[in-house]
């Protein structure tokens, strides 16, 4: 969380810039970007007061998932129940990517074995997926590449999605390494951390981007 202050004081930040991290964490700005890319998201809103949150929840319909910005692993997230609709029976999945700011590589898509909205500490995933169709796998990879390239991510990125009624929705983007990187690296035989390190230090080393085709 100190990256922005360091940058303001002249410290060069390697990899993804603090402004891109802000873009991913600010729910309103991120939704604007998804609208621009024509990538669907569940209905949502951003509130700074209880009254605003109640108004947004009333428009969306219950149950709603409430979570703060700038947190890791679903910390502070709550599901508020009532009677209406949300992504009631959605399958959650995620994808890790390596990007050099212009091109992105998505080695795999992981399928969660619990429904969308479970805290990451209580979640588990499988790779390769069992229940995600080939069409949706390609859609997830395409969305991940588009978002990484639009945000000019440099290094690792994690995307979380939900699939309901055979439609893929973006839940959030995390322009950083995630807990699933070791799993993807091992299963796909892709050295993701060394590749990301080469990318974020390429300006210093002068070596070309190692993003795989």
Question: For each of these PLM feature ranges, what is it?
Answer:
Residues 1-10:
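Short Gly/Thr/Asp-enriched flexible loops that form oxyanion-binding sites at enzyme active sites
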Residues 3-4, 56, 81:
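Catalytic core of soluble alpha/beta enzymes
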Residues 7-8, 30-32, 44-45, 68-70, ...:
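Generic detector of short, locally flexible boundary/turn motifs and exposed helical patches
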Residues 14-77:
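A conserved helix-loop-beta module that forms one wall/lid of the active-site cleft
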Residues 11-15, 37, 60-63, 72-73, ...:
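ATP-dependent carboxylate activation and anion-phosphoryl transfer catalytic cores
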């Amino acid at each position: 969380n100190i990256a922005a202050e360091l940058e303001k004081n002249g410290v060069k930040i390697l990899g993804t810039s603090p402004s891109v991290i802000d873009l991913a964490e600010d729910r309103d700005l991120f939704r604007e970007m998804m609208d621009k890319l024509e990538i669907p998201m569940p209905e949502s809103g951003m509130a700074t007061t209880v009254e605003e949150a109640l108004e947004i929840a009333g428009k969306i319909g219950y149950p709603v998932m409430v979570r703060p910005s700038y947190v890791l692993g679903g910390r502070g997230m709550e599901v508020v129940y009532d009677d209406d609709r949300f992504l009631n029976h959605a399958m959650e999945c995620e994808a890790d990517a390596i990007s050099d700011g212009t091109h992105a590589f998505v080695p795999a898509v992981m399928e969660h074995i619990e429904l969308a909205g479970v805290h990451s500490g209580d979640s588990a995933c499988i790779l390769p997926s069992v229940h995600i169709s080939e069409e949706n796998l390609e859609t997830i990879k395409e969305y991940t590449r588009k978002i990484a390239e639009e945000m000019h991510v440099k290094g690792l990125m994690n995307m979380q999605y939900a699939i309901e009624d055979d439609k893929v929705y973006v839940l959030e983007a995390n322009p950083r390494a995630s807990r699933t990187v070791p799993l993807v690296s091992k299963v796909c035989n892709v050295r993701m951390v060394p590749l990301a390190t080469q990318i974020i230090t390429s300006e210093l080393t002068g070596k070309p981007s190692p993003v795989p085709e």
